[in-house]
């Protein structure tokens, strides 16, 4: 059936972007600038002549700065400008008076280390241009506005023109310098235009070329991109990127001639296909990935520096500095997770091919994959024509991680390496049992303080990178060359909406629109609404997020009441929920098998954390995922068009344009990457501009120009979907994997100790049994084994037996139905575990454990600095005793992770996320040959990543070691309440009377309760107190709502209470209502099929006729809605 393709809307960010220069040079006054705060956000290393700061409003740019622009490129004719839509690069590169900023890491010699590592692994070094004769003098930039010692300068540039900045092809117009206000300080911004805009008659254009700026871009930006594309010649990547952006060569292969291939891949059986697929992946990542990064995106609250919530309680400069340090410490978890993970995206070094397996039918679309392995980075390579490219690095002894590998992970950039070292200083070390001689004080006082160190010569032993590396050495991954297809770890920021509750996207009613049409009369009760209703009802009982029970439970009876009330709320809501599924014809037994946790990875570069290293991780993550998506497309195309006998460059000249066109329809909305195509227009016929040639000589002559867009259609990525399958699938799985999910059929004798109540029985043991001399563990373990209870003074036997019976019965029931490997630590978690276990049991899921998703949230801890020498900064150390005396009273800020927080709650706070991802590919059903993808959540590799990822070897549960396979983890750091304010929408505020009305109407829902009216009165008294004395019928109508027809019953009870003169309290009203309660009567109910004498005889004419048409009416309506357009 043919359908019309929806045309992209012209009302978008690109169309609304203003026409502006390619970038700006900012001249900032030194006075009043927060250098210490900015230094903590920057990436300056010791001795650097350039550094970067995040692009933030009211720190580096003005508050009304345009982050998306139509950047002017050149003139098509005398009256028409060619513009290119682009977002701004997220960094402001400081290049003048950088000495005003403090180094982020005080250890020296990082530039030497990075240069040596770059040469060791065969990557090209930066070579400054010598052919540019006419360059602008730095003095000419600041002299019209400030003196040399009173200012510093930085440059900002759009993504599409950063290559032009690197090569020195941008020209500043000093006469057009504009004064702007940046957080109350007056600064000047000077526009930068492309040299192509100027007349060819200008022989001496004052180009802006600063070697330190170009070197920064080469090392910190372009080397990272080259690594992601597996190319060692960084300069060739920059030239290719420039051609693509400036000459619109998106459909042409540009970097194939710069590719080199490992000798192992060249000598394999299908070497030509292997090389071609590698080249296709790199070319598509260049064409699509870099264009995605240039695309306009929505600016967000993260960019507003002055509105960061971390500063709300800061009163002094020291408070603000401490707030930034704490935030940096929380972010450090994500960085050192990458450095310590064997399968980090930083360690993706090649494209590999799976070997054929005879055990199961292998999915051919997953044949080629992104391979991690630091050992491959040292392999010798050759060009496509067989010429040697890289001779290989010497094999490192025993596969041990070295500082050169750390430099490789930092893209050989001393700036990124300094930032990584700063983050690692917050990391706690884990001593290996095989490292008996490990001693940080001994190392600092002896080896580090000697002149043998080639980086600091012993002058800075406490903060030298060698000392930091020694402290953390046992946590770094081994240098190996894996052959297995594993997930790779990526980092970014989560989207606004995620399905991270225990059953994820179950019962969202979003799957099929036709189901909604068929059952439009049935109310949709989604799983999300179920969770919200349970949470709201429990909150009225005092059970909220983090409630552990001590606030509600004071003795045995309150313990029983609290848990029974929670059980009643959960069970009643589950019954309503399951009934709704039945009414809506949802086959929940089949639907439950396909549910997933869904995490949305945001592709908006402006949402990324304000840090150069996180920007680097974002670039590498996006480029890796795009290459992963395109691998099966490249493989199938090469199979249809064999490359045997042709070099990759020759083959791509013929086929790349077709591949580029095909991939455009294959990358978006196929399961992983979502996005949209924007039609860019410029609504105004003319734009305000100036005579650019006369502006060079200082004369500003305004003029009107027409605008033509270089690209009218832009593909803008939105999110990357990462899914985690919840219910175990038994198909084609190995016994090892099954053993991690299958639930043991044998009954456990420790069902109470490992049950859902043990946490509360232990923490409230002294509250319920104040005179007990035995521990909670001994008491309940003895009871579960021998069915005996101790005789405790002050505790009645009846209460003790009632508690034991409840705990035993409920623990047994939990043990029978539990398929969630979660031990509740709060009352709300207990309720959610009971709720989801009940749903899973109703859906027939009792044989296998469900996969659980947990977040690793950073927590800060200040400890003694004895083993954290970096707090001494650049202090010299003479001996071990000198070190111990110097650090005696000092403390260090460190970070650890906790598993206590609910991932669904944290996922709503726009967290920074670090997740292991594997992209699986498959084809559609019913002969559909289109390739779809699914981004599945994977696992972290490496024992040093985090202590919470090390599987339990012992414990009460005595599980097998493969039980960790049913647990998935995500590192999360919330940005809401740190860099983004919480939503304070007044429409979301709840008044007290609303809560009272909701509680009252919830009571009416339990229509089987004989005392329903008494309970309503008690709820009103509980909420209103003495105000009940003045209650009116209008008030009752508000509180009762649709149940107002029952108001006479409520009103009569209020009259009784008023006449009694009792105070308006719950205790007194209970007594009054108890005294007036009538004796219970026994009622006899008769079925409607029995004819009663009082029922009038039925008139035959008015009786409904049961015909075949009425019995099948709903089915006919369903068929009619489907087949309405078919001529029968």
Curated annotation (Swiss-Prot):
Which residue stretches belong to region Required for nuclear localization? Answer: 1098-1128
List zinc finger spans: unnamed: 453-466
Organism source for this protein? Saimiriine herpesvirus 2 (strain 11) (SaHV-2)
Arranged from A to Z, the UniProt key words for this protein are: DNA replication, DNA-binding, Host nucleus, Metal-binding, Zinc, Zinc-finger
Q: Could you give the subunit structure recorded for this chain? A: Homooligomers. Forms double-helical filaments necessary for the formation of replication compartments within the host nucleus. Interacts with the origin-binding protein. Interacts with the helicase primase complex; this interaction stimulates primer synthesis activity of the helicase-primase complex. Interacts with the DNA polymerase. Interacts with the alkaline exonuclease; this interaction increases its nuclease processivity.
| Pfam families named in the record | Viral_DNA_bp
Q: What is this protein called?
A: Major DNA-binding protein
Family per similarity comment: Belongs to the herpesviridae major DNA-binding protein family.
| GO terms assigned for molecular function | single-stranded DNA binding; zinc ion binding
The compartments listed are:
Host nucleus
Q: InterPro entries annotated for this entry?
A: DBP_sf, Viral_ssDBP_head, Viral_ssDNA-bd
Query: So what does this one do?
Result: Single-stranded DNA-binding protein required for DNA replication. Plays several crucial roles in viral infection. Participates in the opening of the viral DNA origin to initiate replication by interacting with the origin-binding protein. May disrupt loops, hairpins and other secondary structures present on ssDNA to reduce and eliminate pausing of viral DNA polymerase at specific sites during elongation. Promotes viral DNA recombination by performing strand-transfer, characterized by the ability to transfer a DNA strand from a linear duplex to a complementary single-stranded DNA circle. Can also catalyze the renaturation of complementary single strands.
Predominant localisation class: host cell
SUPFAM superfamilies of this UniProt entry? Viral ssDNA binding protein (SSF118208)
Name the GO cellular-component terms: host cell nucleus
Gene3D superfamilies documented for this protein: Viral ssDNA binding protein, head domain
Quick one: a GO biological-process term for this protein?
DNA replication
